[in-house]
Amino acid sequence: EEYVNPKKEVNSVKEAIDGAKDIIAESVSDEADYRIWIRKATVQHGKVISQAKDENAESVYEMYYDFEEPVNRLAGHRVLALNRGEKEKFLTVKIEAPQDDILRYLEKKMIHSDNPYTTPILKEAAEDSYKRLIAPAIEREIRSDLTEKAEDGAISVFKKNLHQLLMQPPNV
């Protein structure tokens, strides 16, 4: 109760605890080592999932209306197709990470003793940090990396095909 201070807009014990959880969540999300581990786990064990916004709509993206593939096996042309389908509002695309493993990892890093008062608060802070702060950022990073690699691959194929076309003898 010593942290309750109406002058600082902390009017109850619950508000004080919620404020502490927010601070902990922010701190956890700023830990570079945690982000590196979570990103690696998401790339190795996560899945790219796409679903139709309207299953009755006909489009060239129908094969992606109920699609799922491991992040680390997604071909470049599929990344580009998923991006187009999302941009054209036929698909919703997300990365599903191994959330249970990630939360266990964070809890193991954050909780060093089993205290009946602090353990539940730290678990909630870990989950909030992951779901609200870390997961969206990691998903954006991974999707951006996948898109960049896919675009580089497409340019490379185009370059190779153009070179072959230009090196053909002229038709006389």
Predicted regions and their residues:
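Duplex nucleic acid-engaging cores and interfaces of nucleic-acid transaction enzymes
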Residues: 1-171
